[in-house]
């Protein structure tokens, strides 16, 4: 257990040395200035528009930064043979995997806290707290997905492409379902039925990220605690699947 915690500690230390948190802070400051511009341009409901813009853009920005950091960190370790060196010691592969995942999860919690503080002056604190906890779950889930993809592909470009394709599809799957069931389409056409089946299958397989970190919690007030329960449940289920897949892929590699 101490070795796992040591790997997690060095993973967090690497994030500090590569100035990831400074990058997140700079992005939040720039987006905050952009939200002020949106507030001045808007004619009505200026605060709601400012909050919505800052929340949506900050969520996408921090997810992009975290996933890119996880990918670049892991690829650098593979290329520098750091993984081989660690696994040559008395350390099981599962210990290395959980150490890295724990470190990236800690970084995700710090980034979620920073992002929530950036919104605390615009929205009620209960809504910000719910939004921040949901963002932390979303970041942890995306970090686990990126870790799995890097172990599988061992290259940044295919891994990041898959991660963001997955994220955009999971985030918009409800809208895709509505479009596939539109009354403007011919319900008897085979193409419409096939598309509907494919979309339903994807909606069953993918996590419903559209219900994560909703901007409405900030501008309309927080929902019931059951909304956070759904987020935690989805994060736990899909996080466990990603951990199992990542461990399987790591153990079958010849390192």
Report residues per predicted region.
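Aromatic- and glycine-rich beta-strand/loop motifs that create alpha-glucan
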Residues: 1-22
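Alpha-helix N-cap/start motif
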Residues: 93-94
């Amino acid at each position: 257990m101490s070795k796992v915690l040591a790997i997690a500690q060095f993973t967090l230390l690497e994030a500090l040395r590569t100035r990831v948190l400074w990058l997140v802070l700079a992005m939040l400051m720039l987006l905050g200035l952009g939200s002020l511009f949106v507030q001045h341009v808007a004619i009505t409901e200026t605060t709601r528009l400012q909050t919505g813009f800052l929340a949506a853009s900050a969520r996408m920005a921090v997810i992009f930064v975290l996933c890119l950091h996880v990918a670049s960190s892991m690829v650098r370790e593979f290329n520098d043979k750091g993984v081989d060196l660690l696994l040559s010691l008395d350390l099981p592969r599962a210990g290395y995997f959980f150490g890295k995942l724990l470190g990236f999860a800690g970084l995700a919690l710090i980034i979620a806290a920073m992002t929530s503080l950036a919104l605390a002056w615009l929205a009620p604190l209960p809504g910000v707290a719910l939004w921040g906890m949901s963002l932390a779950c979303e970041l942890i889930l995306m970090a686990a997905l990126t870790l799995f993809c890097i172990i599988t592909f061992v290259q940044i470009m295919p891994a990041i492409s898959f991660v963001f394709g997955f994220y955009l599809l999971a985030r918009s799957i409800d809208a895709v379902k509505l479009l596939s069931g539109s009354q403007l389409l011919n319900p008897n056409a085979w193409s419409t039925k096939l598309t509907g089946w494919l979309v339903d299958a994807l909606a069953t397989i993918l996590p419903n990220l559209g219900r994560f970190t909703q901007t409405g919690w900030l501008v309309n007030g927080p929902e019931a605690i059951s909304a956070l329960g759904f987020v935690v449940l989805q994060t736990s289920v899909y996080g466990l699947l990603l951990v199992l897949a990542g461990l399987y892929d790591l153990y079958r590699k010849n390192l």
